[in-house]
Amino acid sequence: MYVDPRLVILSRGPGLYSTMRLTEESQRYGFITRVIDPMSISTAVDDDGAKIYHQGWPIQTDAVIPRIGFSITRPGSGIVRQFERMGAIVHNTADAILLSRDKIAATQVMAECGLPVPKTISVASMDDCMQALRTIGSYPLVIKASEGTQGASVFLLDDEARAISLLAQMFQRGMRPLIQEYIEESHGRDIRVIVVRGRVVASMERKARGTEFRSNFHLGGSVEAIKLTPDQESVAIRAANELGLDVAGVDMLDSASGPLVLEANSSPGLEGIERATGINVAARIVSSLRARVRERIEEGDMPPNQDVPHGSSIESHLDSNEASG
């Protein structure tokens, strides 16, 4: 007999707004929920398959919500992949997280699928910078790091000298810069859309504070609910789908030619958009995951919950491997 499904929320900040909201709603939807720091997890692979340990004991779960911060993208994604191998239902997969965090790779995928994106150039060395700046063609322009979140390492440059100086500093720090066209008509404004399994559940416009051109909520920008046009909604859904994201915060700019996709965030913050829209976004995410668990149970692909057997600690796993060797 199947009892309440188990959920692991991978987060380094159990007290963060988004993590607390997801925990609250998951418990309301009947999940037995644990919040675990992904960097406190150990993994093992042997003849019996993939295993995950926390504080010396194995983790058994039916579903996972990864809230993987930028600074632990690669090791965190490795943990997510291990859960996938163990058969857990994961919102979002490791591959989708890695792709969405790589701005140039994500832009390439979206452009190849016909999605509208700003003109963007990735430069590998200072030798390529002058040609890239000429290709963009006009100032001001945007320079950003190829990886980053919440508006970090994003700059607006209004002349060539400052652009060259910034690019040189980024290379010295081991960063790979992206040079991007500036969309004047959307200065200091962008649109954040939350997409959950192919459906828009909430949307807002973000406006920068004062002279700041970055509109991120965590940088002090203001937010308000907006109604998307059919074109904006279609573009947001397609962007999430093409990047393989079950849950995405899609950022778009309004240009004279229509919406342009900037990026899609695999761990979108919930505070700004829940406050702006009054929509229970956390519940929409958890409800979607609960439906996936229900589908698997009905298909007979999910075994009944079982208690962790005595003696299955990581120490016993290592002892059994030594004995078999």
Annotate each PLM feature.
Residues 70, 265-277:
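Glycine-rich phosphate/pyrophosphate-binding beta-alpha loops
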Residues 141, 201-202, 248, 260-262:
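Protein kinase-like catalytic core scaffold
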Residues 12-38:
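Short, charged N-terminal beta->alpha structural module
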Residues 39-84, 95-100:
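N-terminal glycine-rich "phosphate-gripper" loop used for MgATP/nucleotide binding
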Residues 2-12, 19-24, 55-59, 81-87, ...:
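Active-site nucleotide/adenylate-binding loops and adjacent lid/helix of ATP-dependent enzymes
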Residues 173, 212-261, 283-284, 288-302, ...:
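A long amphipathic alpha-helix within ATP-dependent nucleotide-binding catalytic cores
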Residues 152-243:
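Phosphate-binding site of ATP-dependent enzymes
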Residues 10-14, 67-70:
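Structural motif
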